[in-house]
């Protein structure tokens, strides 16, 4: 694992793009996370086998969190963030796991002066999925349609 590249990609996203107030993880941190803390690193590589995106994965029972990620921000046309999460979702699906997505991030950002912005996640069942899956998604659609932006903001979203 190219720890220097992973550290650099993390820095591009969390430090350069967002804020130098974020944790400044080092190569040693990433090495310890994998070798001592049991985390894994999912990496996307380009045609030259160079890491262009990564996500650090913490897996507890059937729930996965991503405590750190990074990608090459110098080439926005590649959509590396979307590719990284597509690869992550594909792996989670194969493992039968759930992703704890942005847990607590809203409160964390508000305390640092962030402006609340709603995030959306699209759920779509494949056309060939069974009636039970289709039915569950229809139920979720009905329940979700009752949740308004105003309610979400009142709940602290």
Sequence positions of predicted segments:
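Acyl-donor binding region in acyl/amide transferases
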Residues: 61-126
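Generic, low-specificity signal for short hydrophobic/alpha-helical stretches with a mild N-terminal bias
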Residues: 11-15, 26, 70, 90-91, ...
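A conserved beta-strand-loop-helix scaffold within acyl/acetyltransferase catalytic domains
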Residues: 1-76, 157
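Polar/charged alpha-helical tracts
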Residues: 1, 28-35, 94, 138-142, ...
């Amino acid at each position: 694992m190219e720890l220097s590249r992973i550290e650099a990609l993390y820095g591009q996203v969390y430090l350069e793009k967002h804020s130098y107030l974020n944790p400044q993880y080092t190569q040693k941190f990433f090495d310890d996370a994998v070798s001592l803390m049991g985390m894994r690193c999912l990496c996307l590589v380009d045609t030259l086998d160079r890491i262009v995106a990564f996500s650090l994965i913490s897996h507890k029972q059937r729930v996965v969190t991503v405590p750190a990620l990074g990608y090459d921000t110098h080439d926005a046309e590649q959509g590396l963030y979307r590719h990284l999460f597509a690869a992550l979702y594909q792996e989670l699906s194969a493992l039968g796991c759930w992703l704890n997505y942005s847990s607590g991030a809203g409160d964390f950002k508000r305390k640092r002066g962030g402006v609340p912005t709603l995030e959306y996640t699209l759920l779509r069942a494949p056309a060939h999925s069974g009636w039970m899956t289709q039915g569950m998604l229809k139920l979720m659609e009905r329940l979700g349609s009752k949740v308004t932006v105003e309610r979400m903001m009142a709940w602290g979203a």
